[in-house]
C-alpha cells in the first residue's frame, strides 16, 4: 500500500518538474509594450498599451500589435517581433532572441544565456 502511494505521488509530480525548466524571455519596446517567448516551448506572449490595435493573419495568428509587426516561419513559430529576430535549434527550442543566446544541457534544460535581447 505504501509503495502505491509513493508511485502515485511520483506520477503526479514528475511531469511538473520536467515542464518547470522552461525559461521566459521578456523585453519591452520603446513604447512600453512587453513581449515574451518561452525558451523551450517557443510560446509567444505580449502586452498592449492604450490605443493599440491588433491585426490578424488569415490563420488567426497576430500579425501586428500597434506599430509592431510579427512574422512567422512556415511551421508557425515566431521568426521576428518588431526588430527582434528569433532563431530556433533543430529540436524546436529557441537558440537566439535578438542578441541573447541560449545554451541547453544534453537533456534539454536551459544551461545558460549570454548577451541581451536589444
Segments the model singles out, each with a brief description of its role:
Residues 1-22:
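Bacterial Sec-dependent N-terminal signal peptides
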Residues 23-118:
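Repetitive, compositionally biased segments used for assembly/scaffolding
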Amino acid at each position: 500500500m505504501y509503495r502505491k502511494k509513493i508511485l502515485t505521488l511520483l506520477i503526479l509530480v514528475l511531469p511538473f518538474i520536467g515542464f518547470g525548466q522552461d525559461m521566459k524571455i521578456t523585453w519591452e519596446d520603446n513604447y512600453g509594450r512587453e513581449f515574451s517567448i518561452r525558451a523551450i516551448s517557443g510560446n509567444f506572449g505580449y502586452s498592449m498599451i492604450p490605443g493599440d490595435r491588433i491585426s490578424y493573419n488569415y490563420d488567426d495568428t497576430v500579425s501586428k500589435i500597434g506599430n509592431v509587426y510579427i512574422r512567422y516561419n512556415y511551421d508557425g513559430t515566431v521568426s521576428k517581433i518588431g526588430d527582434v529576430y528569433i532563431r530556433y535549434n533543430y529540436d524546436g527550442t529557441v537558440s537566439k532572441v535578438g542578441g541573447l543566446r541560449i545554451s541547453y544541457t544534453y537533456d534539454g534544460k536551459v544551461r545558460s544565456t549570454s548577451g541581451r535581447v536589444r
